[in-house]
Every structure is written in structure tokens, then in C-alpha cells.
């Protein structure tokens, strides 16, 4: 279920402050964040965010088609190692 339209999109105030500061300074450094729940705004396009996945910060370069999605959608938190293989040599199931 999506967020109500009357509430509008959400982004952490500290994250918006960091993006504004980068826009003013004309430097493109990586913005470190723990806010996976923040919605990507059009003003974020072209910036690289280091989004925390529970272990480390993973860099995410924001492009135009990412607007409206959450930062956490682009950084998986779980590692899938695959299913166990069947034992076909013995013929057992």
C-alpha cells in the first residue's frame, strides 16, 4: 500500500540539507546516509548516495528513472547464496 497523496513524499530533513549543501558548494562527493526510507526527489538526480545495507554503505548513483522510489529499493539487505543442489548420483529425492 502506497503513501497517501495528501501527505506527500517523505525525505529526511538531514538528507535534504546535505543535498542543498552540495548544490551550493558545486562539489560532487558521496553523501553518506542511513535513511533507506527517504523518497528520491528530482533534486537528487546526478548525486551519489552511500546507502547503508546493515553492514556497509553501498554507493547508489541517482538517475532520472529512480525519482519517486525509495533509496533502500536499490540496495539489497540480504545475500542470496542459492538453493541446495539435488543429489542426482544416488537417485534419491
Curated annotation (Swiss-Prot):
This is Small ribosomal subunit protein uS19. Protein S19 forms a complex with S13 that binds strongly to the 16S ribosomal RNA. The keyword Ribosomal protein applies. NCBIfam families: rpsS_bact. Coiled coil: none annotated. GO terms for cellular component: cytoplasm; small ribosomal subunit. The lineage of its organism: Bacteria, Bacillati, Bacillota, Bacilli, Lactobacillales. HAMAP family: Ribosomal_uS19 (MF_00531). One of its GO terms (biological process) is translation. Disulfide bonds: none annotated. Keywords: Ribonucleoprotein, Ribosomal protein, RNA-binding, rRNA-binding. The keyword Ribonucleoprotein applies. Belongs to the universal ribosomal protein uS19 family. The gene is rpsS. One of its GO terms (molecular function) is rRNA binding.
